Amino acid sequence: MINHNEWLIVGLITSPQGINGKIKIKSLSDFEERFTKPGKRWIQKGNETPIEFELTHGFKKPGKESFIITFKGINNRTQAENLKGQKILVKVDAIPKLSHGEYHLTELINLNVKISENNQLHIIGKVINLSNEKNNLLVIQLLKNNKEVLIPFVKEIVPIVDIKKNFILLTPPSGLLEL
């Protein structure tokens, strides 16, 4: 399991590209430089300890959310194929600083989830994970039954995020929490 206080998943390795060790990745990041700027990246297989790799080159495929990248030491298709399905990580301390009112999705993990009933805020659960395939779904564990529900992270459903006060406010449509 990834320690979200230390690591951020920024991409998924989907396939080799060609015969010279190039790798096709699916981006889970809004920052293209994570795949185009040379430097350290980490690759994680399953829940194993991440392994450091040196990104030497990368470019975005036109009209796609995927990139073609090259890692130092990955020189042929077989080596690239062995990385298929693994996650590309960066260290949280290397994450770009954001403007006031902005936050990284990983900061949402462990926040309390509140709803408003009769003008009172009530804690109904906790954000325990993210399901981020460009859909930005919050995995919330409900207090009443320990059930996990997926909540779309959109302004209409999550209008308030207060990192300092450790909560998000939900305004779920009828039935969303019962799914």
Swiss-Prot record:
Alphabetical list of InterPro entries matching this protein: PRC_barrel-like_sf, PRC_RimM, RimM, RimM_N, RimM_N_sf, Transl_B-barrel_sf
Cytoplasm is among the record's keywords: yes
Swiss-Prot/TrEMBL GO biological process terms: ribosomal small subunit biogenesis; rRNA processing
One Pfam family this sequence matches: PRC_RimM
Residue ranges constituting the PRC barrel domain according to the UniProt record: 100-176
Keyword Cell wall biogenesis/degradation attached: no
Location in the cell: Cytoplasm
Gene Ontology cellular component list: cytoplasm; ribosome
Superkingdom classification of source: Bacteria
One MF term in the entry's GO annotations: ribosome binding
Record keywords, A-Z: Chaperone, Cytoplasm, Ribosome biogenesis, rRNA processing
Family designation: Belongs to the RimM family.
Domain notes per entry: The PRC barrel domain binds ribosomal protein uS19.
Quaternary structure note: Binds ribosomal protein uS19.
Its biological purpose: An accessory protein needed during the final step in the assembly of 30S ribosomal subunit, possibly for assembly of the head region. Essential for efficient processing of 16S rRNA. May be needed both before and after RbfA during the maturation of 16S rRNA. It has affinity for free ribosomal 30S subunits but not for 70S ribosomes.
Protein name: Ribosome maturation factor RimM
Naturally occurring in which organism (per UniProt): Prochlorococcus marinus subsp. pastoris (strain CCMP1986 / NIES-2087 / MED4)
